[in-house]
Design a protein with these regions (language model features):
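C-terminal motif of bacterial Sec signal peptides marking the signal peptidase cleavage site
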Residues: 7-11
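OB-fold nucleic-acid-binding modules
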Residues: 13-83, 87-324
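Sec-dependent signal peptide recognition
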Residues: 1-2
Length: 324
């Protein structure tokens, strides 16, 4: 009860027992020296662990200063593909970041809306090269190589997340990549940003030990709490290639390969669209091999736990963002 009372005065939401029009937060609610850019926040992490360094994998840095970041919402979990995450973008520093929240974020945070985040007590974590902002990890999280954890209850969300004014995404909020500029205009500074990839080619085939398109079957054997994962080819299983697997109440992630050229998924200009079996477009058919089109997605990076086998992945908000 004491905690709840404190948070009712210091948090970002109204008192549920005394409802009133929702507060719309603005810069005027914070001291000028509190507000920093998303890039400046990330640089706190990079001051300890250099960008791209394997030394930072699975590590976190707790924020001890009373910093506030702001950004526009650039993600939506309404289609079921984004899970327990909210991505925001700061036009000032042209940087984006993932906030580790809970589910149904689209109900509370709308695309284009400004969000303020009180970061003190939160943790910047590095999972497979992607920097996110959440709460400090538990020992159990660290054992699983998770560098931070979700704001898993409303009290934490109320304390740290401050909804601002509604708005719209503009052309300035989306980085445009084409076959002629991908080699120079796109780098790891854009991780966590909303990017429109124009003129991509859909590919089928093998890269290393992986075949595309494919899905990852997760089987829990003999009551085990950890799954055994097996990558399977739609074609070999006699299935129509779709963005993900969703049959007989079994839902698995699917992976599809899109490219600007090259022969492997590790070549620059090659991207994996990874889609949840819980998304509402899981069973949409993939394009014909060689087809070209555009994809708008959150730009992300993924690797093995040791930092090898790096791929760049595209996190799609909605099937409407895939135009083939």
């Amino acid at each position: 009860m004491v905690v709840a009372a404190v948070l009712s005065f210091t948090g970002c939401y109204n008192d549920f027992d005394d409802p009133a029009p929702a507060k719309v937060w603005t810069e005027a609610d914070f001291n000028k020296d509190q507000i920093i850019t998303i890039k400046q926040l990330k640089d706190i992490y990079y001051a300890k662990y250099a960008p791209g360094s394997t030394a930072g994998l699975g590590k976190y840095v707790e924020i001890t200063e009373d910093y506030v970041i702001r950004g526009k919402v650039i993600s939506s979990d309404q289609a079921g593909n984004v899970y327990k995450s909210l991505y925001i973008y700061d036009e000032t520093s042209q940087s984006g970041i993932e906030l580790k929240l809970m589910v149904s974020n689209y109900v509370y945070y709308h695309m284009g809306q400004t969000i303020y985040v009180k970061t003190k007590g939160m943790a910047l974590g590095n999972y497979r090269y992607m920097i996110s902002l959440g709460m400090p990890p538990t020992e159990a999280d660290i054992e699983k190589n998770y560098a931070n954890r979700n704001l898993e209850n409303q009290l934490l969300i109320n304390e740290h997340i401050c909804p601002g004014a509604m708005g719209e995404l503009t052309e300035n909020d989306v980085l445009v990549i084409t076959p002629s500029n991908y080699e120079t205009a796109l780098n790891d500074d854009a991780l966590g940003r909303l990017v429109r990839f124009e003129g991509l080619t859909y590919k089928e085939g093998t890269s290393g030990n992986n075949f595309y398109p494919s899905y990852v079957e997760a089987i829990y054997e003999n009551g085990k709490t950890e799954a055994t994962y097996t990558s399977k080819s739609y074609i070999s299983e006699g299935l129509t290639p779709t963005y993900a697997y969703s049959y007989n109440n079994q839902r698995y992630y699917g992976s599809a390969w899109f490219s600007y050229g090259g022969t492997t998924t590790e070549d620059k200009g090659n991207y994996i669209v990874r889609v949840s079996g819980y998304s509402n477009f899981a069973l949409q058919p993939l394009p014909e091999a060689g087809a070209t089109g555009d994809i708008t997605a959150i730009y992300t990076k993924y690797s093995s736990s040791s930092g090898g086998f790096i791929t760049y992945q595209l996190l799609v908000n909605s099937f409407n963002d895939i135009n083939f």
